[in-house]
């Protein structure tokens, strides 16, 4: 059993038959060795108890009920005074029933069977190691032809080297005639080979270091060859070089991990623990079982039949033995990856059986659904939308999601503040959505961060912490600056929200995972919170108003129609372009819909007179009755007195530019205020505003 405190990683790879035997076999206190599943039965139809040596045998996998054997006897678990520790009548140990979740069994195969993953999957490891075509190896595995087995210093009946095709008519019909079953088996074991046994023999004879040396020599020879000028030949040479590189890398991996290639052919087939392939009783006569149990039953049936043909029968035709070996190979293929070799195995209702590959792989497989992306409590999921008014470290959480995630916290505070007498009353107030519930929820959210995650989580910025704010609707609101870290956009992406419960998790969220603390990329150090997509479009729209200069706008008749207000009769003249003393007046006029976002206006500004070019001539000069006059330039206006003193300076701008300037100014002030506070003691820090 895997202990999460002692095992920090999980590695999937090939195992030896000895390791499978170690996992499955166990020695009972009386010295009897159990672990092999020999019967294709599950439960007895009368007693409704597991069959002995079957797929749910209690001797092999442990008791169904803790401390109770198949006979019904009871022992206290962990009591060393209780003796014996197993039932002498049925052979079942008095242990915890949880052992049935990890105790395995095994099936001893009558003939070696090829593991189909390493033959049919891409890349095919068998093809890479043996350097033979895939169709040739498939015919060999599924008994399509024989492989002549040369024996040194011994006379052989078949004086052939290489492949002896089974489909050749003389051999197909003449060889079985001269031999009985046992004689033919002896002949085949001595001079012929087919099926998974032939692959296993070739893999066992491989010298991995010689493979690396020969492949390297051949690769160097191909590398030194010049181009032939024939595109097809050059591609063929390139594919061969790539194959040699893969072959050398695979051989090095086998050597580095101390794995023998012959382990890719199975002699012992592991049987999963019963709790991972359960059977449920619906009614007295109806059972619901896992598909894996049905495939195991077929494997045991075919394996027992082949064992009987090889051990007991004398005059069984050789073709029947070969056919049974092929059926056994196909049954094991269906267990590992149903349908990978052609027609999948089906039940009586023409439904395809679900194999181990189907259970493991895919989005709903055991790895991604249970181990990597396991569903957890205190979590939710929704679509994300933009929240431009949010702070960088805040997110908008829908009320419906927030009340479900923080329901336990709300109930606690309702009882603590004597607003509810018990849990039932508190839940009733939550269902009625009373105002006090939302007030308490907001108080909780002000001090409790949440984690937002967008799959796939490829780097640490794929999950960040935020302080939630209650929003209407059902969508999670997100600041657009944090989208790059999540690799998210607002075209229907979904994000998951999690609530850190322990103090350690909340401290980690606050100190390490807040979004405003992850502004730089952890890989290259570049800013990760940069304006993109919607923000750039918004900045463009905000600053794309009529600000091209008074000459272009007023005196160019071709452009005049492009710079008009919503009123078609509106034309930019001095009287129609309003003057404002400050930005607040301009914003107020916009809210009263007296000006547009891109309408040009004159704003009084404290402009440094040194930046005004002395040699620049005004475009127009307007004189007033009191002697003051206006000098109008391309982008600014100067109001002078009779004595030519500068009274006011106005700049020609738009409300969009004013808004952008105010945001930048507030951000700079906040930055310097934060830097200033960080240098002061905590007791004299200045609060913003």
From Swiss-Prot:
BP GO terms, sorted: DNA-templated transcription
Gene Ontology MF annotations: DNA binding; DNA-directed RNA polymerase activity; magnesium ion binding; zinc ion binding
Location of this chain's protein in the cell: Plastid, Chloroplast
The protein's enzyme class: transferase
Gene symbol of the encoding locus: rpoC1
Annotated protein name in UniProt: DNA-directed RNA polymerase subunit beta'
Species, as recorded: Helianthus annuus (Common sunflower)
Keywords: Chloroplast, DNA-directed RNA polymerase, Magnesium, Metal-binding, Nucleotidyltransferase, Plastid, Transcription, Transferase, Zinc
Function noted in UniProt: DNA-dependent RNA polymerase catalyzes the transcription of DNA into RNA using the four ribonucleoside triphosphates as substrates.
One term under GO cellular component: mitochondrion
Catalytic activity from the UniProt record: RNA(n) + a ribonucleoside 5'-triphosphate = RNA(n+1) + diphosphate
Binding note for cofactor: Binds 1 Mg(2+) ion per subunit.
Subunit structure, interactors included: In plastids the minimal PEP RNA polymerase catalytic core is composed of four subunits: alpha, beta, beta', and beta''. When a (nuclear-encoded) sigma factor is associated with the core the holoenzyme is formed, which can initiate transcription.
Domain of life: Eukaryota
Main location: plastid
Reported cofactor(s): Mg(2+); Zn(2+)
One Pfam family from the record: RNA_pol_Rpb1_2
Ligand binding (Zn(2+)): 69, 71, 87, 90
Family assignment from sequence similarity: Belongs to the RNA polymerase beta' chain family. RpoC1 subfamily.
